[in-house]
């Protein structure tokens, strides 16, 4: 409003009219020397001054900062002012709005919440009273809308109410500045900065005074939009208008701080200092000065300034920044409890929007060892600042070392750590600490990448820091190499780690370290030595490994892993007794170790000692795990024990059901404990297959293979089920796939299985090859030999049964029968070789019978061999005969092709000779007209031609021809021009046919065109080039009246240079014509026609009317115009319609 508290024009005097004065008598109150409040009240009351004068006097006191008198006058005006005049309602509303605005301003500035609420309540009462007088007055709505902005924290819809009222005021009074500023403020708080700038600029244009705060608002909008140059310009402009504007100084100082320039930083600090001197409680100046003194190590001074900023301000974001500065000061002083307190307040002050507060609070949580809370804080920072490398490094390290109660959550944290550290190393690839953390996280999931990171960290330590890697790091590198089966490199790193650790322990510093940390250092050394022995074991240097294990258990008798490895080494040497002794020694040191009891149980299981093995696994379940959480491995092992007893040939029949139930029970228990236990599921499938439930067994095995394709046994079991279901080809495929996938090409057992499948599928050659591969590994296996003989016998029998067989096939079958006979006789006569490795006995009687059958087949094979040889001989003779006939036919075809080729060559030669003779004849014909031309040049033909051509009006070139000159053009050029003219004439004929009126005219034109072309062709054959160039075409004279009679007519014997000032053109160029010319004269398009003097009319006319070139003669360039007709409306149709007549002048060529 124009008379608002901030926008009232200053007056030097206030004139108050005297009571009952008929003249203009007034009492003047000097504004520079205002009297006391009581005196002014007496004057106003005595003269019964109007309410408007009370308001003016009160505002003047407010301008002079005498607020008490201002309030006293306005509050007294309601009951003591004169109200009997027109427009008093408006003044009453005005007085209420001024009072409400005062209380509104006081409430906005008040820090105490209770007082703030009281001030706003008083303003609300006054505004409600003013609403009863004139609710929709624009000045009242403006002030009330600003009141909504001031108390916006009480209700969420205050912005909407204020915006609605501002919109109404702007529509009612568009030039009012206050609603424009209010809309700009609302748009700024809604983060619609472009709209805010629009309203700020509009307010500046409407404002009668230059207000610096509007420029400050524009600067803040540009800063929020990231347009720092424009923001800087706005703040500088505000300071030009008002040099002591604190907000402009602070805004400009913040921009200068972000330039990171030394001079700019000094200027920014000076601006903040000036702001502080002008307004000591300005929070922005206080905060930035606190930040400045913090970096100058004046911590207490920085903390004091930050404390004042937090005390003198109610803005949540500024309070959060102030608390953060206070927490940082306490953090730098080592007062971590105080730092935690202020960081926490900074986070809570602005609803967690202050990012750096989360960072500092996370550091305090790390100091308190509250890793999970620290992870939450740094995770928040990382989401808001995803490219901050410091946050990524700290967060990744926290994820790498946190230990959560839930294993799934721990695994998830590890994965997040991998992601964060990987992103960090992509930016900072020279941080060895991050490399080590990420390498530790990747040891189990990506050993190759982990190894690269470890090696990179070692290189960075050696090159950048000149620090030798620690033994623990070298040990980890060796373990990774060993997991990747690079045992030589693993051995190298284990030895380096061992030497490095021993070197540290032998030094004086290392000795002190050993006294302080003797147990960890010894354990590290034992671990490195154990890993080195394990690596040597993988390198097949078992003697060295065994000695190292013995040294380890001797030095540290309680190192149970050494006993386990010694037991395994002796077990692999088939020294079962010594293996059991080592394992029993391990049991002495650790009675509750399930691994030791498991290895002992496996020893009994390997020796088919079912009862001892059963007791060991039952001991593990009952004593070690107390039947609370059973060991899945022991359950599966017990199931295997019961199932193996089913396969024992000496088992009792009545115990079969008990074994099946117990084995199935153990497998099911293990599967319930570990639903993904493939060994338990495979055991259930084996029990179902034993019960001949082939479909169910196949389903179980298939599910196991779907879950993991690296389980070799399940592939074999699926193939076995296919064999039992007589699916021979499927079994062959499964056996072959398992052999390729698991690289079992040299496995004799698998080859034996495959051979059986081939045999069942009647693929005898493949079965023979598979058995041969199997026998290479087990030469003493009687069962393999027997099966090989069976295959040889059956293969030979199949050959002998065939109707068509060669002598080679019969000979091979005889050899197979002989070898099979030897195998059967060998097995039947040797008692010590008649049992297979599975314990299954091969009957000698059957072998003897098979040998006898082989001999019978050999007898039959001799007759088959003779017949096969006879048949082979006949086939050989037939093949020779066919080959001879084939060769004779090929020779005949070659001879025919040669004769045809010679005939073609002769034909081409004849055609070539004929063409040469034709060319010679043509040359004679072409020379003949030149001789005639020479004779005629001296005769009377020239005179006759000149006489006949008197009617032509020629250009200079044509005139030269009539004089016997060539006009500077040779014969070759004239020939080319004639060809061009002929082509253009043919094109014009086509257009005339297309534009002509009916089919009769088309036929007549076509006939004339053909006759003319035939005549031209004959003429060209008779005349030479020079003669052809001298023949002139016929011209026609149009009788059209469309040409201009008043134009001068060119002389027939004058040249183009004299008549037409235009540059000379070629006689084939087309004159420029209008569209009307094209409509009436299609025959003259792109051609020049010679104008002819008509003897009857004595006038020269062009080829059409209305043309721009009617004053020039149209030169015809064709010599066959006797058949041309004017096109369009100027020609006569076939039905005899009238048209302008043309007089045809024929040349001597006709």
Curated annotation (Swiss-Prot):
Biased composition (Basic and acidic residues): 993-1005, 1013-1024, 1060-1084, 1132-1150
Gene3D superfamilies listed in its UniProt record: Tetratricopeptide repeat domain
Gene Ontology process terms (BP): regulation of DNA-templated transcription; transcription elongation by RNA polymerase II
Amino acid composition bias (Basic residues), ranges on this chain: 975-992
Gene: ctr-9
Subcellular location: Nucleus
Alphabetical list of InterPro entries matching this protein: Ctr9, TPR-like_helical_dom_sf, TPR_rpt
Protein name: RNA polymerase-associated protein CTR9
Domain of life: Eukaryota
Pfam families per the UniProt record, alphabetical: TPR_19, TPR_8
Coiled-coil positions: 848-916, 972-1028
Keywords attached to this entry: Coiled coil, Nucleus, Repeat, TPR repeat
Cited function: Component of the PAF1 complex which is a multifunctional complex involved in transcription initiation via genetic interactions with TATA-binding proteins, elongation and transcription-coupled histone modification. Ctr-9 is required for epidermal microtubule organization during morphogenesis.
